[in-house]
């Protein structure tokens, strides 16, 4: 019924994950937005996910490790009772969309590959309101949380520079 469709849409969120190629190089960015009106719980999830992204970006400096980024992201979301997906991670990016190193949204400070000036990476927290367990849908592409609770996803492409992280996909 129309009422059921409206109820489904009213508190829904949707992630838009886009990749573009320019002059042979890839850029990758994602944002999760409400579909129409959303409730306070979803609004908080969206806010915390974006803030966790920027906590991770602050760690994207030469000499730090991918573990520093992941630790910053996970440490940011945990006090809210949220979790991060472990099956999907950020990544290096350049001529190919997915390059080394992998950038998990969890980790131990000082562990994993060291970041070097000139690297370009994608940091992309995928934050769940509940558990991090996921189910891949029959189409082989769609993914939902096993507990049915909402998840949000934000991403930016970041250049590692001597002057700090440079966000290459910053939106106005």
Give the residues covered by each predicted segment.
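Single conserved hydrophobic/aromatic residue that forms the stacking wall/gate
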Residues: 1-9
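Loop/turn positions that initiate beta-strands
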Residues: 10-12, 118
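Short, surface-exposed secondary-structure boundary micro-motifs
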Residues: 13, 19, 125-126, 163
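Conserved, well-structured core segments that form or line functional sites
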Residues: 21-27, 38-114, 120-132
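Short, compositionally biased
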Residues: 27-43, 134-149
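Acidic-aromatic/histidine active-site loop/patch
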Residues: 156
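The conserved catalytic core of RNA pseudouridine synthases
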Residues: 170-172
